[in-house]
Amino acid sequence: SIGFILHQTFDSTDVLYPKQISSMLFQIISVDVLVAWCVSIRNRILNKQIRRYLILVGILMIFWLTVRIVKWRFLSVTDPMGRYLWYAYYIPMIMIPLFGVFIVQYAGKREDYVIPKKFNLLFIPSFALLVFIFTNDIHRCVFEFPEGIINYNDIYDYKWGFFIVVAWFVSLGFYFTVMLLVKSRVPGSRSFQRLPAVIMVLAAGLWALYSLGILKIDLAAMDCLIIALLLESAIQSGLIRSNTGYNELFE
């Protein structure tokens, strides 16, 4: 139960403030919702390749939120392991947009369709970006720590490498959304089908404000919410086919 989880998470000497409790409850509920979403994807999505990649996206989001819980609740803010868990946030941030590209390539195709091998080359920059992030302690080209690395959690600056990661995340997200809209040929409900594009535009705006330091928000929660909304809106609007009685949507 939620009570048991909270008891295990906070020891008896902790002072539980309402903000802490509400934050922990939100994280637990978010993970539960994502697990349920993955199960529903298995039952709803017709194309097995799209189904597989959507489930992988769900697993990555669960990983993202779980890593966040471990970092903030079980580790000291000066623990080096916490810094690498912070870097681990970027595993889903880099891989989820890539899986989105694969999803859109399979959209509307036969079950035996195999995407061109050239798309596998996208794994190269993905893994290169991950290596770049996890070696940040050496080159400091993603994050810089003006007050020393021991204070990484409180005082850090974004460097040029961070904006490359943002560009990857946003550009592939736009590619996913635009290509779904281009492939769709349903004559009605265009306003609802444009919802994924609207979500992506709002996401880009939030990312820009966050990167410039104007907006202070929970990055992991925001990104998971945006991703889930984007994918579910594509399913509900028929841009990704499901077993809910839609006619042919793609050429």
Residue ranges and their predicted role:
Residues N43-T66, Y87, K118-S126, Y156-L212:
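Alpha-helical transmembrane segments of multi-pass integral membrane proteins
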Residues Q8-S22, V39-K48, L212:
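Short, hydrophobic transmembrane alpha-helix segments
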Residues L181-L249:
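Interfacial "cap-and-anchor" motif at the non-cytosolic start of specific transmembrane alpha-helices
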Residues Y17-D32, N47-I133:
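Individual alpha-helical transmembrane segments in multi-pass integral membrane proteins
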Residues S1-Q8, L25-C38, I124-F134, F169-V178, ...:
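Hydrophobic core of alpha-helical transmembrane segments in multi-pass integral membrane proteins
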Residues Q8-S12, C38, L65, I69-S76, ...:
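Transmembrane helix-loop junctions and nearby membrane-interface residues
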